[in-house]
Structure formats: C-alpha cells, structure tokens
C-alpha cells in the first residue's frame, strides 16, 4: 500500500490532505484506490468528494475513489485504463492530440477511459473523459484491416469525437444543473435564484416578495391580506371590504433572469475525421510513413463582429510524414483550413480548461465555450512540425511548432486581417532517476497566437512541472505546479492577477 500527506490548492484555498492508495493486482488487472481526506486549518472537512446525499452524488463519490484500473499494456491486443488520463491521442492528431482529463487534479478528479483493441478485423482506439459526467466527451478511431487496401490503396482509419455538452465542464456541486458561479444556492438543489438577495429563494414557500420592493408578487391569499391589513393599519383604514383586498399588490415583479441550466440547455460539439497512412520504410531502427488526413467539425460558432451563427469548418492535411530514427522521431504536415472556423488538435491538453468558462463584462456574467471562439479563425494554411528525442537514457525532450498564415479576426480593425496563427509546445521528462531525484517533468503550451515566443499569455497557455525527491527509504516528496489563464472580464487579455490560475500540490508519499 502507498499513501501520502501534504497540502493541495482547491478552488483557491489551501487544504491539508491524507491519502491512502492501496493497489490490488489480479491477473492482468491492476486496481488502485484513491482514498483522500482534505481538511483545513480549522478542522473543517472538504466533503465534496464524500457526498452520499443522492443517488447521483453517491455514484460519483464511489467512482471518485478509483485512482485507476488497468488491463494489459498498450502494445497488447487488448488494453484499457480507467482513471486519470495523462495523454490521449487519436491517429495522427488532427482532432485529438495530447488531451488529458487530469489537468485540474485534484480540484477536479475525473475518472475516464483509454481503450485500444487490435485483431484481424482491424484496430480500434477510444477514450472517455469522465464517467461522473455520464460520458461527457467520447472519441473513437477505427482502422480498417489490411485487406481493405484493395479498396483504398493504403491503410485507412475513421475517427469521431463528441462532446455532448460543453457546459459539463462547469462545476455544479449540488447537481441541479445550474453551475456554482450562477447558482445563488450552490449546495442546495431545491433552490438556485434569489432576485432580491434576502436569503430566500424565489421559489421558496415563504418568499412572497421576490423582487424586494415591499409589495407581494406571489399569489398567496394570507400574504396578500396581511399586506393590505398592515397598510390599512398604518394609514388608519380598513381595506378588508375593498374589491382589491384579494388582488396582488405587485403586478409586475422585476426578477433576475433564470440562470443557465446545463441539463435543459446542452451545447454539443462533434467532429469526423479520416486518415490514410502508408509506410514506405520499415526497419529495426528506422521507419517512415507518409499520410494524409481531413476532419470536419460539427456545430456552430459565432461571428466575432456581428454575433451571427456560423457553421464550423474543415481542416485538411494533404501531405504529412512521420518518422523514427533510433532515439529521435520527427513529423511534418502541410495544413489547410479552407473556409475557417476550425482548429487543428481541438481536443488538446488545455481543452478541459477552455471547454466552457464564465466571463463577466459590464456587470453581466455569461458562459463562453471554446466552440464559440472558432469564428475568429478564417481561411488559413501553413505547416506543422514535431521533434522528439531521447537524450541518452536520462532525458526525453519534445517540441511542436505550427505556423499558419491567413485571415484572423482583429478586434481593433473589427475585421478579418491577414496575420499569422502560431502554436508552440515543449516538454522535458526525466526518464531515469538521478541520485535522489526520482522523476521530473516540465511542459509548456502556447496555442493560436501571432508569436508564441513573445510569451504573452492567453487562455491557450498552460505550463507546469512535477518533481519527486526521495527523502528516505520508501518516502518521497512530490511537488506539482501548474499555471493556466482565464479571461474573466472578456477584454481579450489575461493581465489581471485573478486571471492567473495556479494549481499547487505538495505531498509526502510513503510505501507500507
């Protein structure tokens, strides 16, 4: 059994943690549990991950205790892993490249699925982001068997990805469908709106004056009579015999709008893709594959100027090459977005952070999805390259770069202008321990900016590092830090201090 104790940051608050992580091996299965308790300096227990108040909450609590369940290895005919997914790719990555459901851990603890199957009928690969969301995001790729080459001339695969409701990325503690940020009663699923801020929900049985103007606006005969009686007593008159004695005093209550209900107003997005690949060199220490791929996104986005709905677009890779030379790997693609409204590798490491966010502008809070921002991209074309290399037996490094030229929306010009759309990703991993440093990892991602080397952060920026240091036999100090960004005021930048989101975990793990 392993365990850990330390501190974590959840929703901006520091909590102490005690965790027990027993592992149960069975045949080719490995089952690891994650029994974690959080408490603050006052002894208050963080109960969101120990909530049995309803059937749905109980289900999620039980699922939450699964650290992982794995079967086999990725090279086996059958492999799957249930739990935290560090990295998921589909095919050559036109839709899914580097997706992770663990970027907000431990603040958000997702339990997903990574699956691969290989047999004479072909191969299949799939993933699910989180069973607690009742499968919010699902992706599948089918690669046809080799005997289909007579039909397609080379190996072919089809992919589909669906996010059935982008709003599921918003936190909703009580499960009433209203995200916590717009729910006036985030821990009570019976109530969600309090227009006058008096502590009584608009739908509370004792709330007769919802807008707080002193005049009853809910038809309750006792409350109405009480109002007229009190008014009559104040002015020295008896209204009990008047015709209006049974009438509502307030005929036009001014109430706050109903908050978003993600259960009744889902916003899905999906995509289809096809890819062809043909190996031209296959040797022990070298292989080269040429490929092509195309994808069509399904859904609508918004024109950044008019707000009109636009259909999502298509991305094409008419030519790509992937190669491995000993310790190095290299890939290159020529990319095209014929009509705009498309993003390559849409489901990437930062997707759960960009999926749906709240923006407050001019006193109004609204939900902004990643899909709604695709309207900023017009027709584009350019290249993408990736290099990975093992440096001896100690380090593994990787870097990716995209440079697209075409039409992008400019807020100052209020029009699409010719500009560059670039992305840069880099990572460095320690693959062999050095003295007491048992593991280390650094990563940086900057997507869809004019120049990623200006290091002007956006919502597409995510960076962090992890390290584990052995301080005694069987005892290790683990440190995790991640920084991402949110445009909370909708001004197009993330310069405000509260728009920087830091996630820090410090724990001491031990083996029994």
What is each PLM-predicted segment?
Residues 1-5, 286-288, 482:
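Beta-strand-dominated lipid-handling architectures at cellular/organellar boundaries
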Residues 1-21:
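Short glycine/proline- and aromatic-enriched beta-strand/turn motifs that initiate or cap beta-hairpins
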Residues 13, 44-45, 77-79, 94-96, ...:
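Signature for the C-terminal beta-barrel architecture of outer-membrane proteins
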Residues 22-31, 73-77, 434, 471-473:
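Short, solvent-exposed loop/edge-beta patches enriched in aromatic
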Residues 31-68, 95, 302-303, 309:
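Surface-exposed loop and membrane-interface regions of Gram-negative outer-membrane beta-barrel proteins
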Residues 63-72, 76-79:
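Gram-negative (and chloroplast) outer-membrane scaffold detector with strong preference
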Residues 69, 176, 498-512:
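Outer-membrane beta-barrel "beta-signal"
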Residues 466-488:
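C-terminal closing repeat unit and adjoining cap/tail of repeat-based domains
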């Amino acid at each position: 059994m392993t365990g850990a104790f330390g501190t974590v940051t959840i929703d901006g608050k520091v909590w102490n943690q005690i965790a027990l992580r027993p592992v149960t091996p069975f045949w080719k299965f490995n089952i690891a549990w994650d029994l974690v308790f959080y408490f603050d300096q006052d002894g208050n227990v963080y109960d969101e991950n120990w909530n049995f108040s309803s059937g749905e909450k109980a289900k999620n609590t039980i699922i939450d205790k699964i650290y992982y369940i794995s079967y086999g290895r990725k090279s086996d005919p059958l492999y799957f892993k249930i739990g935290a997914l560090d990295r998921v790719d589909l095919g050559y990555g036109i839709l899914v490249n580097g997706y992770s459901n663990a970027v907000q851990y431990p603040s958000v603890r997702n339990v997903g699925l990574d699956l691969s199957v290989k047999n004479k009928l072909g191969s299949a690969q799939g993933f699910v982001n989180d069973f607690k969301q009742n499968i919010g995001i699902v992706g599948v790729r089918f690669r046809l068997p080799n005997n289909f080459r007579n039909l397609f001339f080379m190996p072919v695969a089809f992919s589909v990805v669906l996010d059935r409701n982008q709003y599921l990325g918003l936190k909703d503690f009580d499960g009433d469908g209203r995200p916590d940020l717009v729910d006036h009663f985030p821990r009570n699923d019976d109530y969600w709106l309090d227009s006058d801020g008096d502590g009584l929900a608009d739908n509370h049985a004792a709330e007769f004056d919802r807008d707080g103007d002193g005049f009853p606006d809910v038809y309750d005969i006792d409350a109405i009579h009480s109002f007229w009686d009190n008014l009559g007593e104040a002015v020295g008159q008896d209204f009990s015999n008047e015709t209006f004695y049974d009438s509502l005093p307030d005929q036009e209550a001014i109430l706050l709008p109903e908050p978003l209900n993600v259960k009744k107003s889902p916003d899905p997005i999906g995509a289809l893709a096809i890819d062809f690949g043909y190996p031209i060199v296959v040797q022990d220490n070298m292989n080269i594959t040429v490929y092509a791929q195309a994808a069509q996104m399904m859904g609508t986005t918004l024109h950044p100027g008019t707000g009109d709905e636009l259909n999502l677009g298509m991305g094409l890779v008419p030519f790509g090459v992937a190669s491995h030379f000993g310790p190095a790997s290299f890939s290159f693609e020529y990319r095209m977005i014929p009509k705009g409204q498309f993003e390559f590798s849409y489901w990437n490491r930062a997707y759960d952070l960009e999926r749906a966010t709240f923006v407050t502008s001019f006193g109004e809070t609204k939900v902004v999805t990643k899909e709604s921002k695709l309207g900023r991209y017009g027709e584009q074309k350019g290249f993408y390259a990736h290099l990975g290399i093992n440096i001896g037996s100690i380090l593994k490094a990787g870097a990716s770069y995209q440079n697209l030229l075409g039409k992008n929306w400019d807020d100052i010009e209020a029009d699409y202008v010719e500009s560059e759309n670039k992305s840069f990703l880099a990572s460095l991993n320690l693959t062999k321990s050095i003295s007491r440093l048992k593991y280390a990892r650094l990563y940086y991602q900057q997507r869809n900016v004019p120049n990623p080397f200006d290091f002007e952060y956006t919502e597409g920026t995510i960076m962090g590092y992890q390290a584990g240091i052995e301080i005694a036999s069987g005892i290790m100090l683990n440190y995790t830090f991640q920084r991402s960004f949110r445009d909370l005021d909708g001004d197009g930048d993330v310069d405000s201090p509260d728009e920087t989101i830091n996630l820090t975990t410090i724990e001491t793990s031990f083996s029994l």
